[in-house]
């Protein structure tokens, strides 16, 4: 019997897998990988060069090639500076690393050297990329201007915070990165050296040091290098503590609702940071002294421990000094006396915020003019309202949020055209020269609805929109539609009372719209393919013309670059449709086009279109801002602490040419950018006069100012040093919030600023203003806290001044003035209005309320106006809101009417209205059907006689009596709706339904069947 001998070594012996090697295959694979990598790199470079080339062609076509070269050169130069600076700072450490490691192993020392070089190069690339990304800050630093005003805490010119401090932070980040990398590398060398020196004797460490070197040499060099890097870090920490003091000026103190150093910062943290500057320098000196003292001794772990102790001691000391004294001072001194303790900080915040946001007079900058309001009363019809015919003539009953859907149904004319959601609210002089408020919609190309969408149609044929549509803000058509002043079948006059600037006859002007708010995809014009223009015009197909602000593609590389970078493929490159006269239009969105030639500007979200009264040309105007988040002690809104409407940008809707007008060339940021891009900004004095007449106060700036003003307005008639100011601010006693309104479902939503034509207190001339009402702070729940406490209006007359003022109208705390929320609440609880909403809901219609308009009259009263839209049953998927009613109200009452005059008649219970209020168009009459189209058998408007002649056919006397009653009740129904007497209208409708039911029964016996009537509803018919 054989014996089995088990050998564990055999069981656990590692066996190498059998590998069949193919040297030829390995070489081919390596070559393929290298070729693939080279191709990828070349493709990336080619795509980047194509994008650069197209951008150069585009900017050159606009006459602003410096906008291409200035950022590019700045970024390249800064990248090289960052590359060399960071690479050199890290590269200084490489020889030390290599020499130190050579004392351990000569081959490892050589590897360390090349590895260090690679690290230095990578660090340089990172540093260069970081610095190149700061190109705007660097250019501003080089061209910066003093503000001529200093912050109230550190008394440094505001330009230091805006222009200088960001660059210091950027350079500091590079230095910190290089110092930390050097310290980490030295620490690695020291750690390896100590590990080898103190390795157990039984561990056999095979060392191959360079000739004449040892592990002790490696440790010594590593310690010296680590100490030098640590000393550099202490110096940087000292500088950081110094500049951290200035960063306190932009820190937010949310607990107390202000920005800037608080009481603890001023009295504790700033002195601590000043002390830490000195302490950090002492630590740097101590580190250098330690290195000098121990440089000639044999290095030991004790030296390393000393260095570690210095670093740890600094971290503990800095942390303790910046936290413990603060906590003690806050608890012992600030919290028990917070109001008086924070008074100085509040004063500083109010001073800086009012300056930064243009809420105080600062030379030529906008100022807030406070206009007192008289004791608020209920407006009387023949005194208050009649005293202000300018406001009455422009009461806005049409709502810009609903108008796009209406125009897309009434005046879209083609499926591939659409009206953008941003309706322009503007003013034009009427035939009498009086300023008239209108709303203007722009008929742009609907890029998603182009018929037979393909590359040719999208790029060469359907290239532009066509014309505008203007409507009256105050008139309502017979079926609840807006009164179109111009634009129906584009550029044909419809309403004889249209403002002259909109009174086109279709023979002049350039109505084509190549640049708009929705026009985004690139196109090519002036090609061998005619463009579709408009079917009812003589030029149904056309070429755009040579004046277009596009670029040509006359060589293969330009054509290929444009095809790939802008059109995402080779279709354009392979197409034979473009010719030598063709021009490519890119960046066709108004905002995008402006930002592409002025990357330093932030463009307002609501560009508006203007018609030239002489040529009919259409021009886009967009407000653009210079802004920064580095302004000290100023309120911060969405990361912005300083904002100025620096530029009025004009874009020709047809040619897409852009002109930038500087509102105030002396403003520091504007002046700096003008120096960086000479010739880019033009003085606003060069703007054509017809454009100046349409300039308006910018919406985004005003919205931000409203947010800031709601709290910095506290006691703005008193000096900020007055103790009452800090007291009221601390308690938020006089803080405001934008007023809220109610939606039909009861949801409270903030009101937004509205462009209105009205008369401001102290000025009898109607003006075009941007207005916002305020309620007490944090009054979102409604009730008594939702009263109106103030309103703020921004004038827009740039023909008088380049900086129209803000007009603030505080209403005082002693008067309870109802606000939009309370007006909406009264409307929702009004029996007649509630009944109408219920009836509409039962018929399947939907109520949509427009914006609440608050109109001041005679410096002592307010009138509330809100449009009441009805959406028919939405089963068809078509949105067609129609303005069926207007809700008006005062302090004590509300009323409903089918137009503003009828609503006022119901509100004041009169039929005698002031001159100018009589409707010029037929008021909408409630339709008995929710269908969006007229009923074919609608009852005609009755005559004055309540009886009607029966139709031929031999009706019985009973049938004739019912028919006569039907006619009478129909007349009553229309009269009741016109007067806003909804209760009586409901009774008339019930009588009509009863008559129809009775008549149906009588006629059925004779073989005649009446159509089944639908439930009555005021839903409009288009």
Ranges and model annotations:
Residues 3-30, 35-979, 983-1020:
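Soluble extracytoplasmic regions of secretory-pathway and membrane proteins
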């Amino acid at each position: 019997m054989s014996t089995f001998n088990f050998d564990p070594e055999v069981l656990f012996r590692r066996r190498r897998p059998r590998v069949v090697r193919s040297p030829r295959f390995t070489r081919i694979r390596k070559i393929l990988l290298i070729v693939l990598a080279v191709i990828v790199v070349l493709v990336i470079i080619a795509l980047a060069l194509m994008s650069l080339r197209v951008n150069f062609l585009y900017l050159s076509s606009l006459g602003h090639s410096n906008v291409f070269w200035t950022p590019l050169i700045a970024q390249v130069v800064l990248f090289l500076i960052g590359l060399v600076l960071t690479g050199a700072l890290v590269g200084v450490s490489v020889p030390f690393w290599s020499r130190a490691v050579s004392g351990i192993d000569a081959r490892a020392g050589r590897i360390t050297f090349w590895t260090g070089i690679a690290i230095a190069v990578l660090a340089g690339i990172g540093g260069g990329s970081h610095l190149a990304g700061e190109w705007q800050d660097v250019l501003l630093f080089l061209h910066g201007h003093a503000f001529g005003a200093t912050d109230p805490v550190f008394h440094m010119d505001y330009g230091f915070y805006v222009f200088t401090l960001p660059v210091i932070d950027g350079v500091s980040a590079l230095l910190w990165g290089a110092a930390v990398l050097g310290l980490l590398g030295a620490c690695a060398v020291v750690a390896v050296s100590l590990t080898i020196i103190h390795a157990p004797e039984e561990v056999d460490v095979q060392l191959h040091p360079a000739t004449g070197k040892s592990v002790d040499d490696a440790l010594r060099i590593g310690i010296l290098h680590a100490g030098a890097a640590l000393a550099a870090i202490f110096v940087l920490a000292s500088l950081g503590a110094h500049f951290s003091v200035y960063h306190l000026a932009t820190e937010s103190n949310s607990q107390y609702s202000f920005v800037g150093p608080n009481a603890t910062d001023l009295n504790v943290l700033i002195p601590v940071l000043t002390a830490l500057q000195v302490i950090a320098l002492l630590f740097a000196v101590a580190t250098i002294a330690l290195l000098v003292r121990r440089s000639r001794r044999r290095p030991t772990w004790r030296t390393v421990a000393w260095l570690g102790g210095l670093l740890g001691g600094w971290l503990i000391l800095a942390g303790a000094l910046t936290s413990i004294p603060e906590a003690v001072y806050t608890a012992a001194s600030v919290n028990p006396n917070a109001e008086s303790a924070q008074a100085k900080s509040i004063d500083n915040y109010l001073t800086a915020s009012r300056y930064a946001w243009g809420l105080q007079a600062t030379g030529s900058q906008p100022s807030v003019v406070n206009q007192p309001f008289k004791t608020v009363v209920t407006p009387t019809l023949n005194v208050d309202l009649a005293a202000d015919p300018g406001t009455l003539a422009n009461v806005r009953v049409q709502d810009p949020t609903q108008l796009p859907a209406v125009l897309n149904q009434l005046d879209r004319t083609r499926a591939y055209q659409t009206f953008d959601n941003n309706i322009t609210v503007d003013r034009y002089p009427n035939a009498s020269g009086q300023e008239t408020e209108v709303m203007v919609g722009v008929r742009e190309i609907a890029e998603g609805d182009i018929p037979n969408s393909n590359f040719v149609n999208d790029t060469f044929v359907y290239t532009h929109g066509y014309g505008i549509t203007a409507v009256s803000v105050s008139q309502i058509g017979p079926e609840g539609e807006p009164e179109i002043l111009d634009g129906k079948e584009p550029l044909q006059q419809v309403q004889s009372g249209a403002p002259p600037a909109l009174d086109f006859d279709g023979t002049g002007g350039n109505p084509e719209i190549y640049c708009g708010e929705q026009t985004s995809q690139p196109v090519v014009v002036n090609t061998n393919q005619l463009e579709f223009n408009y079917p009812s015009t003589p030029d149904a197909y056309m070429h755009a013309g040579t004046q277009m602000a596009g670029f040509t593609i006359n060589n293969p590389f330009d054509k290929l670059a444009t095809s790939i970078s802008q059109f995402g493929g080779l279709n354009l490159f392979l197409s034979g449709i473009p010719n030598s006269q063709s021009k490519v239009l890119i960046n066709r969105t108004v905002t995008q086009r402006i930002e592409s030639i002025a990357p330093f500007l932030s463009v307002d979200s609501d560009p508006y279109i203007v018609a030239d009264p002489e040529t009919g040309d259409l021009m886009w105007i967009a407000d653009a801002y210079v802004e920064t988040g580095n302004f000290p002690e100023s309120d911060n809104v969405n990361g912005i602490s300083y904002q100025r409407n620096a530029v009025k940008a004009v874009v020709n809707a047809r040619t897409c040419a852009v002109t930038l007008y500087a509102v105030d060339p002396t403003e520091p940021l504007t002046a700096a950018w003008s120096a960086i891009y000479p010739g880019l900004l033009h003085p606003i004095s060069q703007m054509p006069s017809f454009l100046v007449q349409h300039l308006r106060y910018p919406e985004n700036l005003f919205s931000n100012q409203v947010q800031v003003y709601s709290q910095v307005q506290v006691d703005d008639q008193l000096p900020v040093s007055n103790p009452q100011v800090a007291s009221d601010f601390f308690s938020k006693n006089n803080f405001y919030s934008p007023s809220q309104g109610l939606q039909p479902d009861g949801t409270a939503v903030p009101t937004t600023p509205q462009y209105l034509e009205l008369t401001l207190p102290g000025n009898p001339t109607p003006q075009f203003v941007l207005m916002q009402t305020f309620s007490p702070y944090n009054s979102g729940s409604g009730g008594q806290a939702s009263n109106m406490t103030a309103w703020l209006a921004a004038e827009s007359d740039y023909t008088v001044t380049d900086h129209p003022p803000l007009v603030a109208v505080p209403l005082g705390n002693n008067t309870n003035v109802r606000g939009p929320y309370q007006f909406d609440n009264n409307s929702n609880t009004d029996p007649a209005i509630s009944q109408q909403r219920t009836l509409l809901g039962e018929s399947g219609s939907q109520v949509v309320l427009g914006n609440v308009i608050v109109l001041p009259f005679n410096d002592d009263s307010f009138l509330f106006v809100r449009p009441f839209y009805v959406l028919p049953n939405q089963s068809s998927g078509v949105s067609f809101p129609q303005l069926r009613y207007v809700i008006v109200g005062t302090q004590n009452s509300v009323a409903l009417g089918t137009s503003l005059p009828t609503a006022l008649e119901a509100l004041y219970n009169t039929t005698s209205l002031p001159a100018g209020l009589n409707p010029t168009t037929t008021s909408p009459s409630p339709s008995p059907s929710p269908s969006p189209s007229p009923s074919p058998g609608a009852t005609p408007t009755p005559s004055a006689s309540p009886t009607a002649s029966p139709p031929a056919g031999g009706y019985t006397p009973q049938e004739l009596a019912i028919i006569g009653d039907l006619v009478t009740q129909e007349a009553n129904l229309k009269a009741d709706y016109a007067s806003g007497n909804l209760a009586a209208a409901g009774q008339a409708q019930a009588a009509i339904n009863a008559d129809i039911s009775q008549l149906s029964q009588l006629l059925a016996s004779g073989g005649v069947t009446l159509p089944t009537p639908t439930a009555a509803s005021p839903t409009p018919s288009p």
